[in-house]
A protein has these predicted regions:
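Conserved motor-coupling elements within RecA-like helicase/translocase cores
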Residues: 343-348, 550-564, 571-574
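Nucleic-acid endo/exonuclease domains
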Residues: 624-775
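Conserved helicase/translocase motor-coupling segment
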Residues: 475-539
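ASCE P-loop NTPase helicase motor core
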Residues: 11, 88-201, 332-472
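Helicase C-terminal subdomain and adjacent C-terminal extension
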Residues: 413-451, 487, 540, 576-666
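Conserved P-loop NTPase motor core of helicases/translocases
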Residues: 85, 91-96, 157-367, 408-428, ...
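A short beta-strand element within the Helicase C-terminal
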Residues: 370-375, 559-571, 600-602
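Pre-P-loop entry segment of helicase/translocase ATPase cores
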Residues: 1-117, 188-213, 317-321, 326-334
Length: 775
């Protein structure tokens, strides 16, 4: 299981390392502030092997880009990156568009048109606008156009969503669509098995020759020819109308020039000459692939033709690799095979469609093999440097993303970033910390057209209208078929301080209470803070709520649920700095709200958010919106049924016993006994039912062992249960009478090797045997 350091502290990796070396105990205390109630810091010594799948040499990539710049051989997408783009496209030939079904609108069709026609296309895809389906249709269209296609993203989740759609059948046969899913070593292990299976597929059922297959392809494309012509005219008319509106606005502002006088009548004439066609009519002209037997037959036969090439002797080396039984060896050999340009070209001849992350694209040859089309999804989350890996390998680029959603996660010190900008005279356009690849290229490239996907199909109207007003300036067109949707706000005033920062106990308790009372199932709980998510999940588990989980926003990007609960995590103890950070990341609210299909519930401390002066606050606006468009609710406290701080029982004791055994194993005069009844330790208490969690004995000078330490681990019940409190007092008195140290520790210290080691060493140095100060 992987855990990010940033989930527990705001220190960078380098700062944490330096702090750990210089102040071990102080650094542990910083970590303790970040762990949840049921987590523990483990300082027991361990040996482990740290290994990366591969080393990425960005300097080599940038050197190659610089060489291309000097030789004036940059590919079109890189020219656009440097602001040297032009309006040139892929000629006057109209692109051929293939749509899987009729779930498409004109904006989506224009996106596909631009991707196949232009060298570079920028797409803003707000939430719920059918972005994934449109990319899927673009892939189908590019496949019918016989293009090699690279689909890349910053992480795996968007890729998985697209790959899931590539499942077709023809005449009761599954179509073995020729694509590969690359990525980390585990993905490669799976992919090589897929290739092994592909070697076993025969072409016997494909009764079409190469020429017959080409005739069938052209037949399929001809069915959508009329629709493509109508779409072309629609776009020309729309551009002319927009330009005319712009000129008229300039005129109203008092501008007078010969250019305006000359251009206005030309635009008016152009608009009159282009036949008007409605968006509905354009879409109705398209023949959907899933209803077209010819199209499905082409997909089936063409896929078989691609895979049949594997039987050529040219692929013998690849065949030997995929037959290797050891998964890791097989994957490593395949990666080595893939790094050779000639091998990559062979592979693309069989599998013209490749899915990979931006970083893993570095394995695709040495960068001199170019894909016909690169589709980069979630480009608003992709950092500049790693995005250039796939961009440098493409002839054409479709860049899809949304700058109003999540930004790249970049671990670079701000001061270092500013120093680098000054040293190398880097403009704000290429500011590594402040930009994604999408924002940089749109700022640098003033020529290329932008496409906005405007039609929203996911959220209830009341829900998405907030995003539409606050983030998209009412440009979104909400589908009339959507439900109204419900929004509500639940004020969670909090005066309970938890030992962990960025937690609101009352809010967490109310969220769980709401889930139980309303029997919530198809739901996600979203919070900006890892610690609040941990607290909510702890309470959900304790209260038997298994269907719902809490997570931060990055975990739910791209997902959708009937109900979304937003837990802001803000309380009266939240620092102004944290709230300022929260307000500066409005994209969290945009993404969180737009995950909800039917119901949005916002929990928060309205008073705290309202009274903290940090400028414009999307969270205050969201609360106001929910109150004006929906309901306001207060959930009564249910402290009797929701408790935190319970002891973990045997789990904690197991962890402590393992830790303490390591310590006493290197101190031969010590031994440890677990769960020792008091009646066995002291004969004068034969009827006592009490026991110590652990007792440490020390060997005397003349032999024999004498008890010196007794350990007890305390959960919340040790401070709230009257019987437990009385029992603890009796244990303390017994220990005092017999000269034994009774050490009470919170559960979180059960795995803290260094703390317990120093505690025992401190005892041996303490001749007076006075009680040690633990906190």
């Amino acid at each position: 299981m992987k855990h990010s350091l940033y989930a527990y502290t705001e220190l960078s990796a380098s700062e944490f390392k330096e702090s750990l070396i210089n102040d071990f105990e102080g650094t542990l205390e910083i970590l303790r502030q970040g762990v949840s109630t049921f987590e523990k810091i483990d300082t027991r010594p361990d040996f482990f092997c740290l290994q990366r799948d591969f080393q990425l040499n960005l300097a080599e990539l940038f050197g190659k880009i610089e060489t291309r710049w000097n030789e004036n051989t940059l590919n079109a997408p890189l020219k656009a990156f440097f602001g040297n783009s032009s309006l040139s496209n892929n000629g006057h030939v109209l692109p051929n568009i293939v749509l899987f079904d009729d779930r498409v609108n004109v904006d989506q069709a224009l996106l596909i048109y631009g991707a196949l026609k232009n060298k570079v296309t920028y797409v803003q895809g707000p939430p719920g606008t059918g972005k994934t389906q449109t990319i899927f249709n673009t892939i189908l269209s590019a496949f019918f156009a016989k293009k090699t296609i690279l689909i890349s993203t910053n992480n795996n989740r968007p890729l998985d969503g697209i790959v899931e759609k590539l499942s077709f059948s023809y005449d009761n046969h599954k179509i073995p669509f020729p694509f590969l899913r690359l990525g980390n070593i585990n993905k490669i292990e799976e992919t090589t098995l897929q290739i092994r299976e592909a070697f076993q597929i025969e072409d016997e059922e494909n009764d079409l020759s190469v020429n017959e297959l080409e005739i069938l392809r052209k037949k399929v494309l001809s069915k959508n020819r009329e629709a493509v012509i109508a779409l072309t005219n629609f776009q020309k008319r729309r551009v002319a109308e927009e330009n005319l509106v712009f000129l008229e606005k300039v005129e109203k502002m008092g501008a007078r020039s010969s250019i305006i006088k000359k251009q206005k009548p030309l635009l008016q004439k152009q608009i009159q000459e282009i036949p008007y066609v409605s968006e509905k009519d354009i879409i109705s002209h398209f023949v959907s692939l899933k209803e077209d037997k010819d199209a499905l037959k082409y997909l089936y036969c063409s896929s078989l033709k691609h895979l049949a090439k594997l039987h050529s002797p040219k692929y013998d080396v690849l065949h030997e690799i995929v037959l290797i039984e050891d998964p890791r060896e097989r994957a490593m050999k395949f990666n080595s095979f893939l790094s050779c340009n000639e091998n990559l070209e062979l592979l693309l001849d069989v599998f013209p469609l490749i899915f990979t992350t931006n970083i893993s694209a570095s394995r695709l040859g040495d960068g001199d093999v170019f894909f016909d089309l690169l589709i980069m999804d979630e480009a608003g989350q992709a950092d500049i440097a790693h995005s250039l890996i796939p961009i440098s390998r493409a002839k054409s680029l479709l860049l899809v993303g949304d700058e109003d959603q999540l930004n790249p996660v970049i671990t670079l010190d701000e001061n270092t970033n500013e120093d680098l900008k000054k040293e190398f005279q880097i403009s704000d356009t290429y500011d590594y910390l402040a930009n994604s690849i999408l924002s940089t290229m749109k700022a640098a490239d003033k020529v290329t057209n932008r496409v906005l996907l405007r039609n929203h199909y996911r959220c209830g109207k009341r829900i998405i209208n907030f995003n539409n007003q606050y983030f998209y300036h009412n440009k979104l067109v909400v589908s009339p078929s959507l439900e109204e949707g419900n929004v509500s706000f639940i004020d969670s005033d909090n005066h309970v301080r938890t030992p962990v920062k960025n937690q609101n106990y009352e809010e967490a308790k109310n969220v769980v209470s709401y889930c139980k009372k309303n029997d919530i199932s198809d739901c996600a709980i979203i919070t900006p803070f890892v610690n609040q998510a941990k607290l909510i999940n702890d309470l959900l588990i304790k209260n038997g709520v298994k269907e719902v989980k809490a997570a931060t926003i990055h975990s739910v990007q791209g997902a959708e649920k009937n109900t979304i609960i937003i837990a802001t995590g803000v309380s009266s103890f939240t620092s102004p700095r944290t709230i300022k950070w929260l307000n500066s990341h409005g994209e969290i609210a945009n993404v969180a709200v737009s995950r909800a299909k039917k119901k949005l519930v916002v929990f928060g401390d309205e008073e705290k958010l309202k009274n903290t002066k940090t400028g414009d606050s999307v969270w205050n606006e969201l609360i106001r919106y929910c109150k004006s468009k929906g309901t306001v609710e207060v959930i009564p406290s249910e402290n009797d049924s929701l408790t935190i701080g319970k002891s973990n029982g045997s789990i904690t004791e197991d962890e402590f016993y393992e830790t303490i055994e390591q310590i006493v194993s290197i101190k031969k005069r010590l031994k440890v006994v677990r769960n020792l009844p008091i009646k066995e330790l002291f004969e004068e208490y034969p009827n006592s039912q009490m026991e110590f969690d652990s007792v440490i004995y020390e060997r005397g000078v003349l032999g024999g062992f004498k008890p010196c330490f007794a350990f007890e681990f305390d959960g919340g019940e040790h401070y709230s249960d009257a019987k437990r409190i009385e029992s603890d007092k009796r244990k303390m008195k017994i220990c005092e009478q017999h000269g034994i140290k009774l050490i009470r520790l919170p559960n979180s210290f059960s795995k803290d090797y260094e703390f317990l080691k120093k505690l025992i060493e401190g005892y041996k140095e303490d001749d007076t045997h006075e009680q040690l100060t633990l906190f």
